[in-house]
Design a protein with these regions (language model features):
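Conserved nucleotide-sensing/catalytic segment adjacent to the nucleotide-binding pocket
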Residues: 2-16
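P-loop NTPase motor-domain active sites and their immediate coupling elements
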Residues: 13, 17-239
Length: 239
């Protein structure tokens, strides 16, 4: 969980790098998406374990010189990459991120929205201030699926859905949903989830596996020019 908007921008930059690395891995094994990659890794893992057992059996209880041992080590089967996990990125308030890092944040969001789905990285973006400087045209164009709760004006409704109607909703979970691939709006109702239920869900998720934290997510990335991204955004006269 990232609460500092500046660190959130760094986390988005990490997500872009992770997406690019995943595409390189998928390109090497000749698959188009994360599903194909994980299926192929399962197959290669089974083949690797069979080859490893055969290799260990062939070299068991044998006394050989260092030179022969080094040659046999080179014949040892190569372990395939691990399967790729799915990543869900949830931005609770886009307005805060856009105020702190509008340029870098918009670029990262756009790239992730355009390409990240096939690599197993998905985005949920929310805001309580649906203005055009927060939900820019570039961001909206790359988020085909949208939801709007009750808003105060027609302008806000058009900003989110490109259509009026959200200003007439009843509130308390009443919403309009735009499915991907269509501009037809569906009126649906969200479920009320209490704090107690949220804690139960979190506890259930924690029971599945212990969290693995990656400290490198917040490391300052270095650009091709040798400057850090943070330094590029720094304006001496303004700051």
């Amino acid at each position: 969980v990232v609460t500092n908007p500046k660190k959130a921008a760094a986390a988005l930059s990490w997500a872009v790098d992770e997406m690019e690395n995943r595409y390189k891995l998928m390109s090497k094994v000749g698959v188009r998406n994360i599903t194909g990659f994980n299926v192929k890794m399962d197959t290669e893992r089974e083949e690797y374990e069979m080859k490893l057992k055969q290799w260990e059996h062939d070299n068991k209880n044998s006394v050989k010189s260092d030179e022969i041992e080094s040659e046999e080590e080179s014949d040892k089967p190569t372990e395939p990459p691990e399967k790729l996990p799915y990543i869900l990125i949830v931005i609770d308030e886009l307005a805060d991120l856009m105020m702190v890092a509008s340029k870098g944040g918009e670029e990262a969001l756009t790239r992730l929205a355009q390409m990240a789905r096939a690599s197993g990285i998905h985005l949920i973006v929310a805001t309580q201030r649906p203005s055009v400087d927060v939900l820019t045209g570039i961001i909206k164009a790359n988020f085909p699926s949208r939801i709007s709760y009750k808003v105060t004006s027609r302008v806000d409704s058009r900003t989110i859905l490109d259509s009026m109607g959200a200003e007439k909703l009843l509130g308390k979970g009443d919403m309009l949903f735009m499915p991907p691939g269509t501009h037809r709006l569906l009126r649906i109702h969200g479920a009320m989830v209490s704090d107690e239920e949220i804690q139960k869900i979190i506890s259930f998720i924690k029971e599945q596996k212990k969290p693995t934290y990656k400290d490198q997510i917040f490391e300052v990335a270095v650009t091709d020019k040798g400057k850090t991204k943070e330094a590029e955004d720094y304006d001496e006269r303004y700051d």
